[in-house]
Amino acid sequence: MSLHQFLLEPISCHAWNKDLTQIAISPNNHEVHIYKKSGDQWVKGHELKEHNGHITGIDWAPKSDRIVTCGADRNAYVWSQKDGVWKPTLVILRINRAATFVKWSPLENKFAVGSGARLISVCYFESENDWWVSKHIKKPIRSTVLSLDWHPNNVLLAAGSCDFKTRVFSAYIKEVDEKPASTPWGSKMPFGQMMAEFGGVSSGGWVHSVSFSASGNKLAWVSHDSTVSVADASKNMSVSQLKTEFLPLLSVIFVSENSLIAAGHDCCPMLFTYDEHGSLTFVSKLDIPKQSTQRNISAMERFRNMDKRATTEDRNTTLETLHQNSITQVSIYDGDKTECRKFCTTGIDGAMTIWDFKTLESYIQGLKIM
């Protein structure tokens, strides 16, 4: 496990470049900081300053090396590097509320932006006019869209929102997409068509994160009522739900076709598996607990605690987990959704941790990624 403390401020979101030598993070403000690996250290190389509201989403396209950002200023920017300088291009989102989340499509020819305007902006580049334009998916979304994930076919888009529902839409844009083949989610895919809807008002909570599996047949999501859910399109849209005893999870991602990692307010990642019978199971917390020891607090730690945990108390408040506050995002570091070898977490404590499954398997008895 390698932990790096970037800041005292929370890291609201992050994204890696293709060869994992650079990470883009937002220190809970209107800026994006790009750090480059130099030996064992991370050195700040660039600051992207164009937004005038909190940045809420970052995604870095691996093939085209473009960064897309969105923020509370209702704007999105596509950043391209020229002669070592990152240049922004404004995207016309046509929204009247904050943008909340952004994600490049697998082919990198479009991206989707969720927002508080109860809609999803699907953006693509119009070469005739030399600008990025957007189309809106509105119905039947009833509240803020918190999370998005693309199906591997580059057309279907999963969205989790504050109306307690997870939906799968078609984001087919005839200007840039080839006609999609039929999938277990459905065969007819005109733009904006809702292919599936899960969740309800009687139970559930805000859907904080959604993730398709590598095949695209399974969709996982985590809600504010501490549940983890998986829908399987190949099993007639059957849904498996696990009500956990933990604090709410904020981020989820598939690390193999049947395993997923989720993390949130409990400050440590957790492994869940989904078997061929459609059963969803909690496997283990993936942290290596530190033994807490009684000690006097230094002046430096006192000030750090004021920033990190809003406390000045002398008693030792260090958590036994590596992260000292809620984890806000989980991403794959080494590998892909078919076979992930290492994954990354960032959190409100301003820290970034890279977790190695081989190391975790040697520490945690009986742990095996399916």
UniProtKB/Swiss-Prot annotation:
Gene3D superfamilies xrefs: YVTN repeat-like/Quinoprotein amine dehydrogenase
Keywords: Actin-binding, Cytoplasm, Cytoskeleton, Nucleus, Repeat, WD repeat
WD repeats: 6-45, 50-89, 140-179, 202-241, 244-284, 322-365
Coiled coil: none
MF-aspect GO terms: actin filament binding
Subcellular location: Cytoplasm, Cytoskeleton; Nucleus
GO CC aspect terms: Arp2/3 protein complex; cytoplasm; nucleus; site of double-strand break
Pfam family, one: WD40
Major localization listed first in the record, in broad terms: cytoplasm
InterPro entries the UniProt entry points to: ARPC1, WD40/YVTN_repeat-like_dom_sf, WD40_repeat_dom_sf, WD40_rpt
GO biological process: Arp2/3 complex-mediated actin nucleation
Family: Belongs to the WD repeat ARPC1 family.
Subunit and partners: Component of the Arp2/3 complex.
Function of the protein: Probably functions as a component of the Arp2/3 complex which is involved in regulation of actin polymerization and together with an activating nucleation-promoting factor (NPF) mediates the formation of branched actin networks. In addition to its role in the cytoplasmic cytoskeleton, the Arp2/3 complex also promotes actin polymerization in the nucleus, thereby regulating gene transcription and repair of damaged DNA.
Protein name: Actin-related protein 2/3 complex subunit 1A-A
Organism per entry: Xenopus laevis
Name of the gene: arpc1a-a
